[in-house]
Every structure is written in structure tokens, then in C-alpha cells.
């Protein structure tokens, strides 16, 4: 551990990583780099997987090291100052809620977090008999809560239209656009719209790359790149007409999987500054001390969560076993913990090309508990059925011993209802697991303890704080649950062979960001040129060895549309490049392999194969 830290911390953070050194994967933004800590993630057992992902999460709280590249971190003075400046502007909205609005917007995980945060802070205001003034926007609309709608994030015009619609009639709008990699066109369109109407809008960008690493390709069908938009926003900082909050939190444990660390850092950063704004509205000044106090509660959440590492590893192993046997993981949560479970389940589909039935989330009260704008969506089909009643009626009858059922609740929830549900599930499977949140002095009844073989018990200290402060414990429990689920599902799919080293190698290519990521992974694993990797990726998408001029001249949006209906696009391209074989031969090899990882591993070891960039680095 380095001994030059400015602030007192609750947890031990890792030493500075190789990723901070000049020249490390320098062509890639931090959010897309591979984390040196998890380089052999695919060879780890469940206990090691938990430890590695725990250490990656701890990087969120690292302070900057003056001896390395000067990345601003969460605890950097400049970041804390900007958080305070934004909190003061939130205060202005809170004082005039009738004419004002705080809008949180994002795509995918970021959009789901926007919903969670908007509802949390509206709930805080309602509890104080004040007017709610938070609103969320998700690319793809409310369908994106429970299904992956990633292609909609490529439309900047739609982003601007959605923003204009929700802000109609408002005179003062604080807009917070979340894009972990500083790349989402949907958010770029909204920021651009704000900067063209600065008399009403104050734009704030949240992400985890320096502006110099923002996506620089011009957005198809639009006038700018994301970087150009971010650079314009940067020029507004000194006049406080716009802000960028972009601390570096390090590469993801699973390369590029921003649902993990990026999502957690988003939650920590925004809840901290918004809570400080609410405290300050009660005549407490916005100070660095206030920000640091709240940030430390999230460090404490990390410590409490990973004190249960052994049990988290057991849950991961059980989940991997269920998935390996073509079973399922069903996550049943109470309150906002149910929404956190739904979020994790939905994100497995694009990240690991999972079937939507593999991991499913359910929430007590269904859409009524989620409080989404469009109301009950269950009529859209079984994928949209998310209440506990839906689970009992439509899913439980087919549950078997190969399935795992995970219940997530607090000891303030209806324990009689929970006990009845446990009894129903036990008739179908013995694989019942529980994540139970308690406050110090609360204990799980013996009747429940006896019926549940495996319990991850998390006990939180009593907080003697004012009303706003009581929300800290709710936020801690949500983050803790998120960390556990991220670790369990990412680890389970790693054990299933969906990860090679620490790279996602079987994700759905359903937007421009993922198309670029696929070509980047191909380059890093094979050492081939960008042009050659793009060519083979297109061969895999279209299933044609010889590409027509029409295909070559198609836009990235066209390629993404074609890729959406295909499976194993990236692994087929990887094996084809490594073996110099046809797309058809590559697909056949993958289909006959034990796992995608094993197909790539054996292709890496083909005699006479030219070593790629990642091979030489790993020696």
C-alpha cells in the first residue's frame, strides 16, 4: 500500500495499477482497457473470482498518484469541487420545484440507474411533503427496464427530442447525462441540445474517461463526435454554465463491462452529490467534509459486502452449476432491491448472449413498485412479467432441482410473506439462497433460518441521522446488492467459459459502441490490423467469405442491424482469424467445443500461429 493518501479511508485500496502507466494500451480509453489485476480471470476458481472483482471495485476509491499519469480520481480536489458546484445548482431546483427539474438520463445500465435515482430522491422529497422534481430518461423507453434495447442509444436526435418533451414548460433544468465511456450518441444529442438552450438548461456529463479519450468518430447521420460535444461542454466549466464529472475509476474487471464498476461509480457519485444538495437545502452548507462523509459510507458498504466473500463464492458456484445444467437463476427482491435484481438479470443478455430466461429478476408489487412512467408493461409478453405473483403463477410450476432461486430482502420487509414464498419454492428445488440486510440489533427469525440452507447476512450500523441521512442506508444496501449480483453473474458466466482472459468474447453487437469493441477485441487477441479484423467481423456477421461491395459500403448502423439476429459473431471471427480458416469452419469448431473459451484457447495454441499483441504482453 502506498502511504501518501490525503484522506482517511475505511478500506484498503489496491496499489496503483499498470493501467495508470503511460503507454499501457494507449490507444484505448480507460473504460475499454483490460485490467491487469484480472488478466487470468478465466482461470480463477469462485473464491479467487470474488477476490479479484472485490479488488477491482475497491479501485473506485483510490486516490490519484502524483508519480503516475495524472488521472483525476473520485477523491481528487477538482472532482470534489465540481460535485459541490453541481450540488449547489441542484439546490436552486429544490427551492423552485414548480418551474424547475433535475433530469437524469442514460442508456442501458445508466438509464436504469437514472430511474432508480430519480425515484429515490422523489421519494425523499415526498417524505418531507415537498414537490418531487426529479425525472428520468432511458434510451429505448420503459421497455429498457426489463429488456435490452441497446440499439436506441445510437440516436442523438431521439435523445434531444425526449429531453425537450419531458422539460416542456420548465424554466430551469439541470440535466445529468450519464455515459460511462463518454460515447453514447443518445446522450451527446441531449448535451448538444442543452448547450443550444443555456438560458434554460445546465448540462452535466457523468462518465469515467478523460475528455481526450471520449469517442472521436463522427456519429452517423449527425454533425459531431461525442468528443467534440464534450470539448464544447468543457469550455463552459469556468463560467459554471456546464460541468463534467469524469473521475477515473480504472478498467472493468471484465474488460468493457461498464454495468459493473461504471454503474457502481455512477450510483456512488450521483447519490453523494444529490444527498449533499438535500442536506444543504436544510441550511447545511455544501462542503468537502459533507461529501467525504457520504463517500466513506460507500467504502463501508464495500467492506460489509465483501466480508461475506466465502458465501458470495458459494452462490456464484451454485449459479454456474445451474446455468451449466441448462437451469436458471431466479432473483426475487423486495422494494428497490428487486429493481437491482432485475437490472442485473437484464444486463446478462447483451453481455453474455444469454437467453432472457437464464437469469430473471422479479420485484414485489411489480411495476407499481418500480414507479415507471409508462406503467404496467406485462401485457407486452412473458419477458415483461416481473412481479412475484407472475413468478408464482407462470414460472414456479416449471422450476426444478437444476434451478437456483435467490431471495433478497431486509428484515423490515414482510417476513411472513417471505416465509410462505420459501415454502412454495422448497417444493420445487432445494437450491434456495438468500441475501438478507439487517440493521444492528435485528435478527432473522429461527423459523426462516431453519428453512434456508444458505444465507448471505449483511448487518448495517444504526445511523442516528436526520431524515435525508436515513436514505444512506437504503443506498448502501442497494449498492451492496449490486456488487454481489455483478460478482455472482459475471463469475458464473466466466466459469461457463464466456470470458477469455478478462475479455467478453460473446457479447451481442447491437450498437456502434459494441461494434467498435468487437474490432478492438479482435485486434488485441489476434494481433491483426484493424482493417483485417473489421473484414473478418463482417464475414462473421453476414456468413459470407467474400464480401460484396454492397456489404463493404454499408454503414456501421447497417452492420449492427445485421448482427442483431446472429449469435456467436465475435467468437467465430476470433477463431477464424487465429486459425486462418473459413467462417463456416470456425463456427463448426466452436459448436463442437466444450465452451467458447476452450475453442479460443485451443486456437491460440495452433502450431506456427503468429503471436498477437495480447500473447506477447502476457509473456
Curated annotation (Swiss-Prot):
It comes from the Eukaryota. GO terms for biological process: carbohydrate derivative metabolic process; intracellular glucose homeostasis; negative regulation of glucokinase activity; protein localization to nucleus; response to fructose. Residues 462-464 are annotated as: Essential for interaction with GCK. Keto-D-fructose 6-phosphate binds at residues 107-109, 179-183, 347, 513. Beta-D-fructose 1-phosphate binds at residues 109-110, 153, 179-181, 347, 513. The keyword Mitochondrion applies. Its main location: nucleus. Residues 90-283, 319-498 form the SIS domain. Coiled coil: none annotated. InterPro entries: GKRP_SIS_2, Glucokinase_regulatory_CS, MURQ/GCKR, SIS_dom, SIS_dom_sf. GO terms for cellular component: cytoplasm; cytosol; mitochondrion; nucleoplasm. The keyword Phosphoprotein does not apply. Keywords: Carbohydrate metabolism, Cytoplasm, Mitochondrion, Nucleus, Repeat. It is found in: Nucleus; Cytoplasm; Mitochondrion. GO terms for molecular function: carbohydrate binding; enzyme binding; fructose-6-phosphate binding; glucose sensor activity; kinase inhibitor activity. Belongs to the GCKR family. Regulates glucokinase (gck) by forming an inactive complex with this enzyme. The affinity of gckr for gck is modulated by fructose metabolites: gckr with bound fructose 6-phosphate has increased affinity for gck, while gckr with bound fructose 1-phosphate has strongly decreased affinity for gck and does not inhibit gck activity. PANTHER family: GLUCOKINASE REGULATORY PROTEIN (PTHR10088:SF4). Interacts (fructose 6-phosphate bound form) with gck. Fructose 1-phosphate and fructose 6-phosphate compete for the same binding site. This is Glucokinase regulatory protein. It comes from Xenopus laevis. The gene is gckr.
Amino acid at each position: 500500500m502506498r502511504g501518501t493518501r490525503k484522506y482517511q479511508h475505511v478500506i484498503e485500496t489496491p496499489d496503483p495499477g499498470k493501467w495508470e502507466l503511460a503507454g499501457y494500451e494507449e490507444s484505448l480509453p480507460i473504460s475499454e482497457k483490460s485490467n491487469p489485476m484480472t488478466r487470468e480471470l478465466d482461470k480463477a476458481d469462485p473464491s479467487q473470482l470474488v477476490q479479484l472483482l472485490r479488488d477491482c471495485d475497491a479501485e473506485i476509491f483510490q486516490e490519484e498518484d502524483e508519480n503516475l499519469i495524472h488521472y483525476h480520481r473520485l477523491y481528487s480536489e477538482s472532482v470534489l469541487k465540481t460535485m459541490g458546484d453541481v450540488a449547489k445548482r441542484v439546490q436552486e431546483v429544490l427551492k423552485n420545484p414548480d418551474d424547475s427539474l433535475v433530469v437524469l438520463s442514460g442508456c442501458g445500465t445508466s438509464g436504469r440507474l437514472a430511474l432508480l435515482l430519480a425515484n429515490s430522491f422523489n421519494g425523499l422529497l415526498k417524505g418531507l411533503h415537498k414537490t418531487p422534481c426529479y425525472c428520468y430518461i432511458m434510451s429505448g423507453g420503459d421497455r429498457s427496464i426489463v429488456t435490452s434495447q441497446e440499439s436506441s442509444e445510437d440516436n442523438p436526435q431521439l435523445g434531444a427530442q425526449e429531453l425537450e418533451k419531458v422539460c416542456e414548460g420548465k424554466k430551469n433544468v439541470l440535466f445529468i447525462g450519464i455515459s460511462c465511456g463518454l460515447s453514447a450518441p443518445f446522450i451527446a444529442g441531449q448535451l448538444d441540445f442543452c448547450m443550444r438552450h443555456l438560458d434554460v438548461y445546465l448540462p452535466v456529463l457523468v462518465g469515467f474517461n478523460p475528455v481526450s479519450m471520449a469517442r472521436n468518430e463522427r456519429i452517423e447521420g449527425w454533425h459531431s463526435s461525442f468528443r467534440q460535444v464534450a470539448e464544447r461542454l468543457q469550455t463552459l466549466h469556468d463560467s459554471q454554465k456546464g460541468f463534467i464529472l469524469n473521475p477515473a475509476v480504472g478498467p472493468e474487471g471484465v474488460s468493457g463491462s461498464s454495468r459493473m464498476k461504471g454503474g457502481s461509480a455512477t450510483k456512488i457519485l450521483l447519490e453523494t452529490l444529490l444527498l449533499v444538495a438535500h442536506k444543504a437545502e436544510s441550511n447545511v452548507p455544501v462542503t468537502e467534509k459533507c461529501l467525504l462523509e457520504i463517500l466513506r459510507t460507500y467504502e463501508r458498504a464495500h467492506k460489509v459486502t465483501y466480508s461475506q466473500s466465502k458465501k458470495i463464492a458459494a452462490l456464484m458456484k451454485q449459479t454456474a452449476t445451474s446455468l451449466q445444467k441448462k437451469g436458471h437463476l431466479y432473483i426475487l427482491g423486495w422494494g428497490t432491491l428487486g429493481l437491482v435484481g432485475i437490472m442485473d438479470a437484464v444486463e446478462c443478455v447483451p453481455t453474455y448472449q444469454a437467453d432472457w430466461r437464464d437469469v430473471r429478476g422479479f420485484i414485489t408489487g411489480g411495476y407499481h413498485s418500480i414507479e415507471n412512467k409508462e406503467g404496467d408493461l406485462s401485457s407486452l409478453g412473458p419477458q415483461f412479467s416481473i412481479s412475484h405473483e407472475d413468478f408464482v403463477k407462470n414460472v414456479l410450476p416449471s422450476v426444478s432441482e437444476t434451478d437456483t432461486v435467490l431471495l433478497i430482502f431486509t428484515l423490515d420487509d414482510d417476513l411472513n410473506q417471505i416465509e410462505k414464498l420459501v415454502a412454495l419454492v422448497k417444493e420445487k428445488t432445494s437450491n434456495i439462497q438468500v441475501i438478507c440486510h439487517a440493521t444492528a440489533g435485528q435478527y432473522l427469525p429461527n423459523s426462516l433460518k431453519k428453512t434456508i440452507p444458505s444465507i448471505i447476512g449483511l448487518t448495517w450500523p444504526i445511523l442516528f441521522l436526520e431524515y435525508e441521512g436515513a436514505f444512506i442506508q437504503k443506498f448502501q444496501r442497494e449498492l451492496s446488492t449490486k456488487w454481489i449480483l455483478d460478482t455472482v453473474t459475471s463469475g458464473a458466466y466466466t466459469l461457463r467459459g464466456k470470458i477469455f482472459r478478462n475479455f467478453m468474447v460473446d457479447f451481442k453487437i447491437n450498437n456502434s459502441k459494441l461494434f467498435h469493441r468487437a474490432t478492438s477485441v479482435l485486434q488485441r487477441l489476434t494481433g491483426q490490423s484493424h482493417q483485417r479484423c473489421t473484414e473478418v467481423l463482417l464475414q462473421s456477421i453476414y456468413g459470407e467469405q467474400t464480401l460484396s461491395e454492397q456489404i463493404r459500403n454499408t454503414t456501421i448502423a447497417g452492420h449492427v442491424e445485421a448482427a442483431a439476429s446472429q449469435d456467436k459473431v465475435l467468437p467465430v471471427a476470433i477463431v477464424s482469424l487465429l486459425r486462418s480458416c473459413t467462417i463456416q469452419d470456425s463456427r463448426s469448431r466452436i459448436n463442437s467445443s466444450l465452451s467458447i473459451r476452450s475453442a479460443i484457447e485451443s486456437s491460440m495454441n495452433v502450431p506456427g500461429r503468429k503471436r498477437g499483441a495480447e500473447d506477447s504482453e502476457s509473456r
